[in-house]
Amino acid sequence: MPLIKYIFRPGIDREGTNYSNEGGWYSADKVRFRRGKPERIAGWEKNTFDSFTGSCRSLYSYRDQGQTDYVGVGTHLKYYVLQGDDFNDITPIRKTSTNSITFAATDGSSTLVVTDSSHGAVANDTVTFAEAVSLGGTVIAAVLNQSYTVARTLTVNTYEITAKDTSGDTVTANSSDSGNGGSAVDGIYEINVGLDFYVKGTGWGAGTWSSSTWGSVSPISSSSQLRLWSQDNFGDDLISCIRGGGIYYWDESAGATQRAVPFSDLGSASNVPTLGLQIMVSDVDKHIICFGANAIGESTVNPLLVRWSDTESASDWTPTSTNQSGGVQLSQGSTIIGALQTRQEILIWSDAGLTSMRFVGDPFIFSFIEVASGPSLISPNSAVSANNKVYFMDRGGFYLYSGSVSRMPCTVLDYVFSNINLGQQFKCFGASVESANEVIWFYPSEDSLEIDRYVTYNYLENVWSIGTTDDGFTRTAWIEAESLDYPLSAGKTSGSNT
């Protein structure tokens, strides 16, 4: 019997059945297609043996003028800058209490009740105490004067922590621990942590119990939603924004351990935004742009307002006839989902379509043109610039932008969107794998609260592939940058906060 050479079509096709897809591939995992043939994807290794706390959903890499490489790392609990092999905690400070904190211990318990008027803390916040004295027994000064994680809040003035020694072992109070720590206790509070899961912005179940009147819409704060950071470099410095929360500035010249500070703390700060949905630096004329910023004189996010600073200034946001600060209220949709900088253009997705933002100079500074109605983003991080085009994922399909928007034919469309957890859609993110001519999107399947699947598109060969993640390949953020010799990603072990 003569031998027959079978040639299989490249790519995965799930639009039919396994039997109807004769001559093609129906399933795969951790496989890509190159020159029409399947191959195992390359391996990976740890970038550093140091670890960060929390789920990282934002990475940003850049190189300063002195050729030092930095990576900003935003998690739902902390904010770091990675230099070399070390994660430096630069989480901004929210509040400092001076000579106003007391402690109360209970015999036989490791729980300490901390009293601090209007502390503003939430569970898992970090607070560092100083100048406390012993409570009289096992809870000595060294136990108190260190950093703690808030276990739970009791009232607006009290919360609980679990006593520990300097090695992290639990300390149990005894009957002699009757003191209160003295009258000179100081406390430094980091910004409130965010959530590790997505919550709809308003409606039943959003916000805290009894925070508004019965039947009214209940907005949620940045500490009550999935923590997403956006980042960019402003020269050698790093700027960042919590989605729906604060905007911060890290001064590289002050050292890698220097905390990031609110924009409002910058010298000569003039009407700087204090809240936003996303931040970036324009590649033309070096304006800092805040999407979903609070308006001048307001203290709430305006979800369609785009504001920008004067050229090459982080502190001057007051529009005048002698500078280039300004702002525009978008008319399409109800909120900005995300923005992406491409060559000579910034794309802004609202929940109703796509707007192109371009630098035009005086007097308008930027132009805004609606280029598409309908297609949006499934999440703020689901648009990818690659191959001189922009690929993005919406709630029901994949799209391509190259001056206009077109829907991408997809041979795994039903496989992806019939089994995706839209309740956690903001965890979805996209990335570029330039060496393989691929765009990859990670997403949670229908029964998963965390990312457990991915889908890739090879734009050179026009083929799709699919796969799953596990403890060795769980990814929550991914970047490719000129300052790196390799893709850099973040992940976590199931059930872990590191």
Residue ranges and their predicted role:
Residues 233-234, 243, 254-256, 261-287:
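Active-site-adjacent structural elements in enzyme catalytic domains
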